Amino acid sequence: MISKFIEKRMLNMLDEWYSAMSKRKMNHVCTLKEKIDQHLPKIKKNTKLWMRYQLFQARHQLLFENQNGLDSLFDGLYGLEDKMDDELKYYLYFFSGLYEMVKTAPKHAVHHFKKAEQYLAAIHNTFEAADLYYQTAGAYYLMKSPPLSVQYVKKALHIYLHQFGYIKKVITCKLLLAVNYIDQERYEKAEQLFKEIIKKTQQLHDENLLCHAYYNLGFLKATEKKDQEALLYFRKVLKNQEFEMNSPVSYLHCVYESVRALFKTGNITEAKAVLQKGKELSEKVDIQTIYLKLKTLEALYTSAEDPYEQLLEYVLELEKIEAWVDLEVLLEDITEYYKKKDDFEKAAFFIMRG
């Protein structure tokens, strides 16, 4: 047991830690965690504080895209669910949804976000609702549902725009809005918004957020089949070691798109080097989807003979893990490959799997 005074003090420290995470104050987040970890013996003596700490530890890892030990951490937390009040249950489901997003399983993420929304009334913080709406919007974007994604991101943006101190959240919402414009083929509007975001982010000196903006602008150019322009932005991200370390999953998405653009523009040596780095990193951080996508590109662009058997194996693996959005573009690339070989039977086979 610990005294009420110490319990209140520890609770305030934990909430300050979570608030810093919500505002993406990365350095402050790490400083607060170090400070809190010094009090772990006290925190472990109080069940509610210990559950809260473990939940926020999961959020901390997700912020830095670190999946190490998260499966066992969440298993343990679900075993304590009957001891949680509605506030802690909200965090449990919300963070579970975020974990599914890191694993690129948006359908499962939405399931958890909807359960979290049932407990939203227990959270006396408007910004928590905004964060939930934003993350739900992100899941719908990955599910190729722009209308629902835009609806949710605008709800989040409305909350953030009316409060001081959430400029980075406003920017992340606008980034998500812009990538939805890409899906809606509103390319000029997307580019204009990306460039506004880059200018603002440069003023904030937030390298992590800036890398996200550069990547997305590169993705727009790749979508427009302007691969040389796309590479100008992708290379800015690839050379940022801090982004690679702190946001490895996002970095890997850029690696994949870079490899694709490099092969298409004939930069074979660079493509192979980036691809090898991507395979090693995706195995290290255990991102199966990106690993399979990179192996597919490798088979498609470097095989001396017909890579049909390899391609089929990777496509079936991606289907098994329901990576439908990822498959969509890959299948187009594979189909185009066989069309150029005048093998229309195989081209038709792969396009029908889309």
Swiss-Prot record:
One of its GO terms (cellular component) is cytoplasm. TPR repeats lie at residues 64-105, 107-126, 130-163, 171-204, 211-244, 321-353. InterPro entries: TPR-like_helical_dom_sf, TPR_rpt. Keywords: Cytoplasm, Repeat, TPR repeat. The keyword Repeat applies. It holds the Pfam family RapH_N. SMART domains: TPR. It is found in: Cytoplasm. PROSITE patterns: TPR_REGION. Belongs to the Rap family. This is Regulatory protein RapD. It comes from Bacillus subtilis (strain 168). The gene is rapD.
